[in-house]
Amino acid sequence: MDEKITSRENAKIKYACRLSSSAAFRRSEGRFLAEGRKLCPELARGAQLENLFYTESAMAKCPELAGLPGEHYLVEDHVADKLADVGTHQGVFGVFRTPVHTLDEVKAGGRYLALERVQDPGNVGTLLRSAAAFGFDGVILSDGCASVYAPKTLRASMGAAVRIPVIEAGAMPDAITQLRAKGITCLAAALYKSQPLSAAQASCPGGVCVVIGSEGQGLTDETIAACSSTVRIPMTDRVESLNAGIAGSILLWHFREESL
């Protein structure tokens, strides 16, 4: 029988809560907390599940949770309330090991998405999901991006955070330099002095990296200068711009895997 946790002050519960609330703690521990009856099993397909916390009612609704790996703990409802990031939850939580990937894994001829200082968790999650859907080989994040493993980002990505390699690369211009050294064309998404998509698509025989900037400021001048060229999405004058999640997803679709 699984161990039952009745106290909100239990050490495992306090540890899991800290993973949920602190990006620095997630990085130092190499772990993250996720919640949801669908999300936890989905994440377990691509990341190591160490601890599963569930309420009695959650297991009754989703008995297949019993087949997941890791240590399982039955928690009382008030304990689950402490673990939850939002007021209404499904009573299922998992502590996972964070997958680790580096720029050394980037392959010539691959398709990549790079995000520079994209701070909205919803946009980061949406772009991870789009990159996975359109057959991209990895996502590269600069310093200052929203945490991939924060609760809101995980919900938005719907498990894509472990279905596609995520590389935390630090300074984006340096990452772009490494990508270009492998023959990858790096396209900076920019509103001005940019080539149209049709021209950009014809110029990427050796792989492509779509580079998206922050919601408010866009890409830094240094990153734009490091890229091969700039690209824009054709639009009417009825709107000034699109948010990072929408613009990035459109670009990812244009450079999707050829078999799709």
Where are these regions (language model features)?
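Glycine/small-residue-rich loop that forms an oxyanion/phosphate-binding "nest" at active or ligand-binding sites
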Residues: 68-97
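Active-site/ligand-binding-proximal alpha/beta "capping" segment
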Residues: 187-239
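Short acidic-hydrophobic, aromatic-tinged amphipathic segments that line or gate anion-handling sites
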Residues: 4-7, 73-76, 165-172
